[in-house]
Amino acid sequence: MYEYIKGTYMGINKEYIVIENGDIGYKIHSSGYTIANMPNIGEHIMLYLTQIVREDFIGLYGFGSKEELELFNKLLTVNGIGAKASLSLLSITNVENLKRAIVLEDEKLLIKAPGIGKKTAQRIILELKDKLDVNLDEGIQTDSNDIKVSSKILEEAKEALMSLGYSEKECEKALKNVEEKESLEIIIKESLKFLMN
């Protein structure tokens, strides 16, 4: 139904980001990777969208690239994989690395995603490895960020990260490695970058 949204980035609210467009604030669920690459609050942004409609839920899911949206949709075709698990997978690394992990049958990377066990990782590989286009000549891409935390907003940041599917232990480790920052959004972004490496 929706292709994309352009609007003003208004911030993160635990389980979603908020984009304002035409005086309406849209709640958009997204991956840790997209959230980590959000601009500063008040800046303009464009996200590629899909809508999920269930009996008890209607939600928008937005991503920074068409490739990430396409991979999200492909992950949803895997038996037993829902939106939460797909976002969890897309939060551990960038799109190319995730596709490469699936094609090369790298279960170890897939099970780093909260909520993804060995059997689920094997099912993802089995159902998607022949359906993904990936350049196997390129090496694994990494974004390194050495990052310490301010205790003032530590709890809020931890809750936001846990709502993305990370364990309490993973969140605490990431937050310990983040520099003291002035805003919750920056702390979450930097923590996500740490968690994806």
Swiss-Prot record:
Q: Name one GO molecular function term.
A: four-way junction DNA binding
Name its cellular compartments. Cytoplasm
Task: List, in alphabetical order, the GO biological process terms annotated in this UniProt record.
Answer: DNA recombination; DNA repair
UniProt keyword annotation of DNA-binding present = yes
What are the boundaries of the region Domain I? Answer: 1-64
Give the region (Domain II) as residue ranges: 65-143
Q: Which Pfam families does the record cross-reference, listed alphabetically?
A: HHH_5, RuvA_C, RuvA_N
List the residue ranges of the region (Domain III). 149-197
Where it mainly occurs, coarsely classed, is cytoplasm
- Cleaved signal peptide residues: none
Q: Which InterPro entries match?
A: DNA_helicase_Holl-junc_RuvA_I, Hlx-hairpin-Hlx_DNA-bd_motif, NA-bd_OB-fold, RuvA, RuvA_2-like, RuvA_C, RuvA_C_sf
The job of this chain, per UniProt, is described as: The RuvA-RuvB-RuvC complex processes Holliday junction (HJ) DNA during genetic recombination and DNA repair, while the RuvA-RuvB complex plays an important role in the rescue of blocked DNA replication forks via replication fork reversal (RFR). RuvA specifically binds to HJ cruciform DNA, conferring on it an open structure. The RuvB hexamer acts as an ATP-dependent pump, pulling dsDNA into and through the RuvAB complex. HJ branch migration allows RuvC to scan DNA until it finds its consensus sequence, where it cleaves and resolves the cruciform DNA.
Entry similarity comment: Belongs to the RuvA family.
Question: What's said on domains?
Answer: Has three domains with a flexible linker between the domains II and III and assumes an 'L' shape. Domain III is highly mobile and contacts RuvB.
This protein is called: Holliday junction branch migration complex subunit RuvA
Q: Which organism is it from?
A: Hathewaya histolytica
